[in-house]
From Swiss-Prot:
Lipidation (S-palmitoyl cysteine): 9, 12, 83
GO CC aspect terms: plasma membrane
PTM summary: Palmitoylated; required for interaction with ADAM10. The precise position of palmitoylated residues is unclear and occurs either on Cys-9, Cys-12 and/or Cys-83.
The protein's assembly and partners: Component of a complex, at least composed of TSPAN12, FZD4 and norrin (NDP). Interacts (when palmitoylated) with ADAM10. Interacts with MMP14/MT1-MMP.
Name of the gene: TSPAN12
One annotated GO biological process: cell surface receptor signaling pathway
The protein's name: Tetraspanin-12
Membrane topology of this protein: Multi-pass membrane protein
PROSITE patterns: TM4_1 (PS00421)
Amino acid sequence: MAREDSVKCLRCLLYALNLLFWLMSISVLAVSAWMRDYLNNVLTLTAETRVEEAVILTYFPVVHPVMIAVCCFLIIVGMLGYCGTVKRNLLLLAWYFGSLLVIFCVELACGVWTYEQEIMVPVQWSDMVTLKARMTNYGLPRYRWLTHAWNFFQREFKCCGVVYFTDWLEMTEMDWPPDSCCVREFPGCSKQAHQEDLSDLYQEGCGKKMYSFLRGTKQLQVLRFLGISIGVTQILAMILTITLLWALYYDRREPGTDQMMALKNDTTQHLPCHSVELLKPSLSRIFEHTSMANSFNTHFEMEEL
């Protein structure tokens, strides 16, 4: 009875962990999709520079190929574990444990590799200044994608230019910065700010923001936290799965063993009784014959006398 209660408890815990796997995997996929626009625009601004290489080394090994594949596979594995737990199927639970172990090893290797790559990111502050060369094509009809990337980055990171907002005046033929540099953006806001109050423009350059972006953003920190949480949850799930496999295996093994032992005990205990019962009629018959012989001899002796 105690073992049956333990099995129920283990199954409930595995149900909860599988649900947690699904939720965290969906969260990782959502955050990865959320970061996609950031990465695309940053790569557009940093094309053919050392900054582009740093962005790729920092984000893409984690965000695109590995984390997305692991999370998609983990959703399927969670379904496998759920079915195995419901049906108490040893084979499905064994596959579930093996899949979790493989996923955990991949995540661990990816984490170590990413950490080493972050240490080796070959970018310096001086590399950010080279981004000024990308500003000359801003606003041109055939470079709309670059214009969109600059506007997106300046709005999202609340910055203007590379070092300072005056970079737009130096590197382009513009008389004032783009409207995306305004703290409160509206059509013509940058012209008004340039003529009246420069404090209405973002004072910090985008070079520092991009440098901070390479060192880690909130989205990347969320991904790391989710990755660590998934790893810890996988360890707990593997421990519970091994325990459940052990309990189910011995629950299936012990009834057969008990029946064999009971049959053996019954055989050893009941055979003497059957033998005694079989011997009882023979003994009674011998006693009757002996009694009849004794009475006959007594009667014969009395007649002789």
